[in-house]
Amino acid sequence: MTMQTITAVSGNDDAATHGAAAPPGGALLSLDGITVTFPGVRALDAVSLSVRAGEVHGLMGENGAGKSTLLKVLSGVNQPQAGTLTLNGTVQRFASTRAALEAGIAIIYQELHLVPELTVAENLMLGQLPSRLGVVDERALAVRALDALERLGEHIDPDIPVKYLSIGQRQMIEIGKALMRDARVIAFDEPTSSLSARETTQLFRIIRSLRAEGRAIIYVTHRMEEVDALCDRVTVFRDGRRIETFESVAELDRDQLIGCMVGRSIEDVYGYRPRAAGDVMIEAKGLTGPGLSEPVSFAARRGEIVGFFGLVGAGRSELMKLLYGATRPSGGHVELGGKRVAFSSPRHAVRAGIALCPEDRKQEGIVAIASVADNLNISARRHFSPARVLLDARRERDLAQRYIERLAIKTPDGDTPIGALSGGNQQKVVLARWLAERIDVFLMDEPTRGIDVGARAEIYNLFYELAEAGRTVILVSSDLAEVIGVSDRIIVMKEGRIAGEVAKAQATPDALIKLALPR
């Protein structure tokens, strides 16, 4: 089966706007009354949905809303107990992923389904390798692979193993696989979660090209800005049901969208709770180091949530690492509770009462293959086993269970690998780890990135509880609504220095952006 041509889209092309999209055609894919049940759970409850040819249809909802189950129905992984799936006018029922692919439906999952040891060309043609007399036709394979890569706009050697490619390049190979099978419906599951800004731009160009060809695109995301940039319509799921389909993204009311997702208003999501601040808990005096262009000075009090806002490269994450002892300052110092401190490592910072929830949660915050209990106990373990020879399994199990219940961490049990949890529940485990350490200062670097709205509300409530208990929370966030909605005051950084501070009452998007923009 040959791959159809993908129309090239330049960075300045008008197709980047909604108005330039190809007019949507009739429904290419229709779901009517789809119901999927598991023991004790109704994952999809009589869901009806249509996706048109030539549109990008966004799917939004909290984790557990039913989006992933819907994709599994489309791909043949799950078979519904009721309802019908109609593709291009024909009722279909897929008994396997192969059947769905052959019918023309492809899913691009977050966890890419490539074989790392095989070459780019072999992955592109997986399951349909060209052969002659029972032997792979290497020449035909190379020609088809080069053709596919050229049409995707990717300059990749087709003979190198996929394991050497970036995440963005691997994702392009997945898209190429779908097009090699001439998929007319392509679903993307949180595709930008691990991509750089450049890779995201390239992905959007490809998706717009696919839309212009008349393919039906399903786009699952938590990110409002991606819906604005890419989608024609958006459907919201909650608790296994389709709540509403918004017919025009250009006229979308964000507050209404969030309300549909979580079942409450946007004010309830942030739920700001004012409180009195106490004495200064942490203070930086003339701090300099990697990522800072000028000496940085600021103070944060007990019971206070201090927001740090800035654009990419402003120096916020670098400042947090200096406070945490992950990097060494070249000048200035830090005071904790009025006493001068100097940390040679994060371990020393933790023992003094400072903890960091890092920006890259998956790489720096958790051990993905370890259990929830092991991740939670990583730091507290030294209290249970001073000699560091024998582990106290019972105490560790009890501690894990206590915090699983206290923070309402959604996991079957403490032995579940943390990598199997949603982003919001992974972040709760990281927070629980530090709660078990009696931390005074919580450095939260982009704590809700990639987390759905409902889980965000739960994490914000944890911040308020910490502040009400006299702890200090420093919130680094690129989300304007979040940093304004949660913080007591906001410090804005720009080009490695503090550009200004904004009080709660004066905090508006315009005020923060004006301070954050480069000269």
Swiss-Prot record:
Claim: Disulfide bond is one of the keywords in the record: no
Main localization of the protein described in the UniProt heading: membrane
Membrane topology label: Peripheral membrane protein
Binding-site list for ATP: G61, E62, N63, G64, A65, G66, K67, S68
A UniProt-annotated Pfam family: ABC_tran
Coiled-coil regions listed: none
Organism: Burkholderia ambifaria (strain ATCC BAA-244 / DSM 16087 / CCUG 44356 / LMG 19182 / AMMD)
EC number(s) on file: 7.5.2.12
Primary enzyme class: translocase
All copies of domain ABC transporter, residue ranges: 29-264, 264-515
A GO molecular-function annotation: ATP hydrolysis activity
Subcellular location: Cell inner membrane
Name of the featured protein: Arabinose import ATP-binding protein AraG 2
Keyword list, A-Z: ATP-binding, Cell inner membrane, Cell membrane, Membrane, Nucleotide-binding, Repeat, Sugar transport, Translocase, Transport
Entry function: Part of the ABC transporter complex AraFGH involved in arabinose import. Responsible for energy coupling to the transport system.
Swiss-Prot/TrEMBL catalytic activity: L-arabinose(out) + ATP + H2O = L-arabinose(in) + ADP + phosphate + H(+)
